[in-house]
């Protein structure tokens, strides 16, 4: 075998070894909240851990994932957009229903054990949920103080919308309306257990409630929300998603984005 052939064979062996060798991935390190301010740059993705709180409904460390806008400037103020997921929830932000613009987005979880008494798979102890999430919001504001609460949005699907309805009605202490000016209910809220108690004064607030038209939707409950919210002074849009069951259609996401851009945020 010639010298060139030997070098070629050796190179092939090295290449095959490299291909079989596992690729090392960078280790993600959790950063304490007290140090997160050092990571604030335009477009940053920040994970807020809350080890002092009970675990979330999935049994994981209480945490919220937050995304800063690409044009973030500490000298400007921005609306915070909180997303509350359906089912067991989660902590991933969702901006699918937002118009073009600069928003701080975050996903917040539900605490373990905050169940509806007769149905453990449903969030139901809204006072506990609000105490849990209010702590998170206050801690986020310590790191990112330039949040414009009057333009901030809380939105949720299914269990998330139930939770918004329920938290609005929690009496005593700081209220949900002190943190947000816009409320979006998707296929949730208006149920016999989420609507227990009185709604607060909603004058100057805006809300959008939507529900599916098909079997399996929350139409029998959510469709009653617009009238209840209007009775307390809110400016409300009620919308039926034609051909949709228990879901959040892309067409409805676009309608909400247009409403936010031309109405809700334009008024703020």
Indicate where each model-derived feature is located.
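Active-site machinery of serine-nucleophile hydrolases
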Residues: 80-137
